[in-house]
């Protein structure tokens, strides 16, 4: 009985870790001995500061040399941050996602203001358009409840 329980736990662990790996937003060598996992909200000023000042140094000195893998994990603290994460994940290409992530952090003071979520979404979508996303695709992504659940479940 103990062996059966162990096998079931092992199967679930492998399944869920494989599922989580497929959804992570990461750059760098997947075989690196070091992985930096950052949980952040796209409306967090300290997170934007980290991304604009520290992340690029880490990228240049460690990620680009294959020494470190960097993973961005969403931890949206509000609807604006959730919607920005959804827009980032509209891209298929991981490098495009990271490029857009950088732009969203860079322009955080411009889009992450106000109380009207529709205006905030339009501001985020303008940044997405600069990153080769189409309005229709972003609208579809924002309506996709599976994307919302995927992002929110990473916080747990």
PLM regions with names:
Residues 76-156:
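Cysteine-centric redox/oxidoreductase cores and disulfide-bonded domains
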Residues 1-78, 82, 125, 147-156:
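Extracytoplasmic thiol/disulfide redox context detector
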